[in-house]
Amino acid sequence: MDRLELIRRNVQEIVTEEELEGLLKNKEAPRAYVGYEPSGKIHMGHVLTVNKLIDLQKAGFKITVLLADVHAYLNKKGTLEEVRKIADYNRRCFIALGLDEEQTDFVYGSDFQLGAEYMLNVLKLSRAVTLNRAKRSMDEVGRAMDDPTVSQMVYPLMQAIDIALLEVDVAVGGIDQRKIHMLARENLKSLGFETPICIHTPILLGLDGTKMASSKDNFISIDDTGEDIYRKFKKAFCKIGDVEENPILALFRYHIFPRYETVVIERPEKFGGDITYHSYAEMESNFIEEKVHPMDLKNAAAKYINEILDPVRKVLL
């Protein structure tokens, strides 16, 4: 797989591919970043962007991970001291998930976001962005509020300035970050900064085929036990022959096949014996043709996800 194929793998959108191709031609070691608001519950949605960072490292990129403690503070997730401790925990988890520590710069927001240069650029951007545009860039929870705080309006402006002052070529995030990334693309040039290329990953559904929600117990947290994962997978939505909005197949596509050259589905001989797959497309085709049973996929997915999460569990012990 060449550099461009690695970068394109499992992404929903690149803005723009032409700019990306030019970057790869002109810069030997470009820099990409993701910002993570420190979270006590890292789930497989977070891991999807970690997987993309690993792909980018293999493609020769230097990686910056912003541990956005100030953003978390503005979002009322705790005191700066509390969210800094969670950020330290997140850093250890991301390394355990496979990020190359030697090739990754971990930056805390509080290390640069409280300085005069940063705040001056946020103020400059605030003069250029309308209130309606800032509100459109807020996260879904903030947009749904009748009376959001000013800090929640400032949040997307800060994300744009993060991209500028971290001096990255590429901003990576879930497709839910698109509005913020487009705000950066539209405005940073006028402030004297480069326009970032943006790579967006899909948003994964919960195990029941609906939106992930902690109240539904329908997502995989990286601190779930092996027993938790087998229990959750057993009741996961995986309609036979149906590949649309199938969370089990999504785990194979986005998390398992990128980390394993071959995937083995273990089955008793009376049900046809083990099947070895060398690509996700091969597995999907067999599933559509009903040559492999949903429960066999669930058991295999649980086994591989547990293997992926084992290094993280050692960090947590």
UniProtKB/Swiss-Prot annotation:
Keywords: Aminoacyl-tRNA synthetase, ATP-binding, Cytoplasm, Ligase, Nucleotide-binding, Protein biosynthesis
Cellular compartments per GO CC: cytoplasm
EC number: 6.1.1.1
Residues bound to L-tyrosine: 33, 155, 159, 162, 177
Span of the annotated motif 'KMSKS' region: 211-215
Signal peptide (residue range): none
Role played: Catalyzes the attachment of tyrosine to tRNA(Tyr) in a two-step reaction: tyrosine is first activated by ATP to form Tyr-AMP and then transferred to the acceptor end of tRNA(Tyr).
Protein name: Tyrosine--tRNA ligase
Species this chain originates from: Methanosarcina acetivorans (strain ATCC 35395 / DSM 2834 / JCM 12185 / C2A)
Originating gene: tyrS
